[in-house]
């Protein structure tokens, strides 16, 4: 048990570093607070966590040392986060340090009718409602952005929009049909989310403007993100994949469609706790339709996988490796063509209640019927 009295210096250090905006946090802090000159003593103070020496690092890998000022020992927040086993983050907009889960903050509602308004509204704690229409991100001015969390990355034939460390953002299309968000560069993803949390897309259609078969970018790309909710939406090709995910957790995909993508429906690596429910993955021309690598607890329930076609010999409709907890329950595989489907190389997948009809699979297909 941690002695609360011993934590007083920790918490004092937390508040101290927040006010002064110094790098003892072990995270990047961008702030313009008031300045106070103080005397500090560095005395090679060591931090042990559960008997193990801990050396908190800064954003550039440098060691962050505790120090003493006026008899109080100030300790990096990174050390506190390690003690409690919680992530630590800094929000420059609210000038807040978060250890573990961030508090729920009511999102600001904004209604937009064109792509300029959409771009201006993007950010944390926003619920953006899109009026019916097409929002072409490539129509935006794409120069230098002073917003460090929203910026453009140059690709081979244009720019790609990056949302970095965005929290609690909802994009919701208004009307009976989804609001459509598109990009023109074939090497750009429509949206790339990096280190984002609590992202929601509702009634959104997203894809590329150019002809099918010409893309090298995907639709939605999630990197080191969590708590993603996609519902009543359509992700379409020519994008390479509808969903690209790496080191991402807790993604929910409900009542939605991925269609006509050129490399497959989705690819994921080092991910966990994904749930696809009441959704359709169809008409993709694929190398491997669904790629799952080094991931766990990926569940498809009441989904339809239909009319997909392999364009390379020895292509697998499911490419699963170094993964566990993969389930296709109550799903339908139908009218898929020329894929390999050998249950012997994917023996740990649960196909309870799943049916197969009208497929032309190569390889062994024996589900104990």
Predicted feature locations:
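Extracellular beta-strand solenoid repeats
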Residues: 129, 136, 162, 170-172, ...
